[in-house]
UniProtKB/Swiss-Prot annotation:
Similarity comment text for this entry: Belongs to the HypA/HybF family.
Residues annotated for Ni(2+) binding in this entry: H2
Origin species: Nitratidesulfovibrio vulgaris (strain ATCC 29579 / DSM 644 / CCUG 34227 / NCIMB 8303 / VKM B-1760 / Hildenborough) (Desulfovibrio vulgaris)
Name of the protein in its database record: Hydrogenase maturation factor HypA 2
Lineage, highest ranks first: Bacteria, Pseudomonadati, Thermodesulfobacteriota, Desulfovibrionia, Desulfovibrionales
GO biological process, one term: protein maturation
Domain of life: Bacteria
Length: 120
């Protein structure tokens, strides 16, 4: 379960960024997670809930944006979705491809709560 170590790293960054901006509470953490990372969303969310206890992110929501796995064929130039985890070009069948997406795991944003009485 590598999700625990991933969340530990995320929480370190969240705490550092909150301190850097004098923020005492984070309301939402947005992550971009590529399909090829092997990250299990439910496990990641459960680890986040556990690791965020007692931190500036306690009670924060975790929003996950799935990044598709894309490939580009060197033979014909086609760009295609690797959702089947088939690493051959569906246009020409060539397996000389470059992965263009799907390995990302990044913090896309941190949101702070609205101040009491503030309007959106």
């Amino acid at each position: 379960m590598h999700e625990a170590s991933i969340v530990a790293g995320i929480m370190r960054i969240v705490e550092e960024e909150a301190a850097r901006h004098d923020v005492t509470r984070i309301a939402r953490v947005r992550l971009r997670v590529g399909l090829l990372t092997g990250v299990e969303p439910r496990t990641l969310t459960a680890c986040f809930e556990l690791y965020s206890e007692g931190t500036v992110a306690e009670g924060a929501s975790l929003d996950l944006e799935t990044v598709p796995a894309l490939g580009t064929c060197h033979a014909c130039g086609a760009t295609f979705d690797l959702h089947r985890r088939c690493f051959a070009c569906p246009t020409c069948g060539n397996d000389d491809i470059t992965l263009e997406g799907g390995r990302e795991l990044t913090i896309a944003g941190l949101e702070v709560p609205q101040p009491e009485g503030a309007t959106a």
